[in-house]
Amino acid sequence: MDSSAITIFVLLLLSIYFIATFWVFFDRYYIINSRISSEARSLKALYTGQSKSVASNSLIFTYLSRVTTPNKAILQAASSDAIRVSTKGLTWLSIIAATSPFIGLFGTVIGILETFSKLGSQSSASLSVVAPAISEALIATAAGIAVATFAYTFHLILKRKAYELSSLLASQSEVILSQVEE
């Protein structure tokens, strides 16, 4: 492989993006899923009357334990804070999904420019000389698209999981507020 320093840098950057994408996904997926399980158990206990308040491992428990009478503003603040903390890293997935195809394309353009530059200095240019160089340059675009596909897919999965968590927290808040009103 006779790649330029820029092409190698582009592929290295895309490799870092790839690792970061999987790191953020698995980390956040585990955290959000465990919180969903915890909040679902807490909500079930509220619905069935096993408990008059959220479980102590609930994300909104800390907020509720500080006030004598829960109100909508406190519960919304608790829910918003829990979602904010749970979805850390989603912005990075968006950035990676949006930028990696362009980074890959940049690597391809540089590779093709270098190929044409080398061809200009040679006396003959046959397909056997041009094709391997151009196919090597296209690897950067393929890598960028692959990284973007994973990042975008993982972003959507985590966004859906965050919505599930938000719904559970909202349901718990509604049950708690209805108990206060009684």
Q: Predicted segment positions?
A:
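Membrane-embedded alpha-helical segments of inner-membrane proteins
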Residues: 15, 121-128, 148-151
